[in-house]
Amino acid sequence: MGRKWNNIKEKKAQKDKNTSRIYAKFGKEIYVAAKSGEPDPESNQALRLTLERAKTYSVPNHIIEKAIEKAKGSGEENYDELRYEGFGPSGSMIIVDALTDNVNRTASDVRSAFGKNGGNMGVSGSVAYMFEYTAVFGIEDKSADDILESLMEQDIDVRDVIDENGLTIVYAEPDQFAQVQDALRETGVDTFKVAEFEMLPQTDIELSAEDQETFETLVEALEDLDDVQNVFHNVDLK
């Protein structure tokens, strides 16, 4: 799982550098989650999970509150969750998740980003079967052995617990996100470096320096699109 964690860490670092963009994306996601049910995280599981994820990116309270208030009031925007799949250089695979109020615009933008940067879009299912939807937590100051022992005592099953570059990483089933996070808090975890849903590749590939440069340009072009929430891939970024 080490390479997978390296990619998650790299993506997190890039998002942390682009605060205005990540805040805008979370503002939209919080609004959609709040509109999907009660605008209260105590009774709206989707909203609660979105807010927990937002905390790891230090999304300011005023952005969170504005999105929730908008959902409570006159917010009329309706968003569709979309997934696009495609390929980059040398067999690299990419998944693009979007949240949009204009499906045609987003499809055109994503297709253009692929086409102009050495990639091409595939059909639905052409890539996703090579990835696993996973809940991922990154924790400081707790060893993997201590975390695993505590989870076992609480009868909580997870996919894996590893030590990686000074952090303990927990991989779990996505539908157990809240249960696992609550159990981790029972172990004394107050702050999560990462608390996120990821599409993790079953296998990673390495690219030549030239192909990796092309690939990174492609991923950046996709991530820069306003409607794109997440980009996942199977490249080991060295």
From Swiss-Prot:
Keywords tagged on the record: Cytoplasm, DNA-binding, Transcription, Transcription regulation
GO cellular component, one term: cytosol
InterPro entries the record matches: Integrase-like_N, TACO1_YebC-like_2nd/3rd_dom, TACO1_YebC_N, Transcrip_reg_TACO1-like, Transcrip_reg_TACO1-like_dom3, Transcrip_reg_TACO1_YeeN, YebC-like
Domain of life: Bacteria
Organism whose genome encodes this protein: Staphylococcus saprophyticus subsp. saprophyticus (strain ATCC 15305 / DSM 20229 / NCIMB 8711 / NCTC 7292 / S-41)
Location in or out of the cell: Cytoplasm
Chief location: cytoplasm
GO molecular function: DNA binding
Name listed for the protein in its UniProt record: Probable transcriptional regulatory protein SSP2054
GO biological process: regulation of DNA-templated transcription
Family statement drawn from the similarity comment of this UniProt entry: Belongs to the TACO1 family. YeeN subfamily.
